[in-house]
Amino acid sequence: MKEESKIVTSKFKHTPVLVNQVLEAIAKLPSELLIKGKLIDATIGGGGHSALILKGFPSLHITGLDQDPSAIDAASKQLLHFGSRAEIISSNFADFVPQEEVAFVLADLGVSSPQIDEAKRGFSFRLNGPLDMRMNPKKGLKADELLEKTEEKALADLIYKYGEEKFSRRIARRIKQDLSANGPYEGTSALAYAIAGCYPPKMRNGRIHPATRTFQALRIAINNELDALQHLLQKAPNWLLPGGVFAVISFHSLEDRLVKKSFLTDERLERITRKPIQADSNEKLNNPRSRSAKLRLAKKRNPNE
């Protein structure tokens, strides 16, 4: 089943990843589950995956979740013409409690392209903006507040744990020295410049920007992303009907390791694929975000079998 996967809304221009693979997984559901027709999109974003699912499977109804008000607005517009088949709820998936069991749960993790591309959100080191990085702009500490409040050792540990950054101690020391001497950074570009200065000169112009891992670490910490994922991995199997499928798309090794371990050890689930599904060469060429995407699938066991 092939679908054109480019989705455009008033604010979001987003190409969802691994669309065909997700559609194929839904198509393989038992017919009685497709007839029941309930699906949870735990990270609806701009509504890209959900729009194509609703288009491809007219019997399905989707409940979409997101904590980003901009994403909620974009998804609402994107899915408006599907009427009552799409329900969108402002919620972090870690806090959600469904009213009934469903046939399919999809989670597309991490930060979306529109969030990165909007400088004022503060996720990007390539576009200068305020140091924010909150998925929900109305809740929690901003990045500049986290940097100010966190002691040097704890900051280094955070950058190492969530960014797997080998220069974490050097970076944390530089950040705290800068804050002490000059006050808060003026924006994301200033922080990225400081981080790059902690790298040996020969490593500053490689394929991966020196600030990549530190920005990832700060974003994960600010939004409690791994804790939320742990909650989802624990709760989502209970949302599924027997034979229903849990699909998770991750974008870095920290997420993927958690998903892999959960799918392997959770007695409620049976892995559909032993190895993660990745984008083909054509998708990687047309959608750079897909290059690091990994899709894992697991099926809810029937407790009576």
Swiss-Prot record:
Keyword S-adenosyl-L-methionine: yes
Example GO biological process: rRNA base methylation
Catalysed conversion reaction: cytidine(1402) in 16S rRNA + S-adenosyl-L-methionine = N(4)-methylcytidine(1402) in 16S rRNA + S-adenosyl-L-homocysteine + H(+)
GO cellular component terms attached to this protein's record: cytoplasm
Enzyme Commission number(s) from the entry: 2.1.1.199
Positions contributing to S-adenosyl-L-methionine binding: 47-49, 66, 93, 108, 115
Recorded superkingdom: Bacteria
Composition bias type Basic residues, residue spans: 291-305
Gene3D superfamilies for this protein: Putative methyltransferase TM0872, insert domain, Vaccinia Virus protein VP39
A Gene Ontology molecular function term of the record: rRNA (cytosine-N4-)-methyltransferase activity
Annotated TM spans: none
InterPro entries according to UniProt: RsmH, SAM-dep_MeTrfase_MraW_recog, SAM-dependent_MTases_sf
Keywords on record: Cytoplasm, Methyltransferase, rRNA processing, S-adenosyl-L-methionine, Transferase
Region (Disordered): 279-305
Pfam families for the chain: Methyltransf_5
Localisation per UniProt entry: Cytoplasm
Annotated family: Belongs to the methyltransferase superfamily. RsmH family.
Function: Specifically methylates the N4 position of cytidine in position 1402 (C1402) of 16S rRNA.
Protein name from the UniProt record: Ribosomal RNA small subunit methyltransferase H
Organism of derivation: Prochlorococcus marinus (strain SARG / CCMP1375 / SS120)
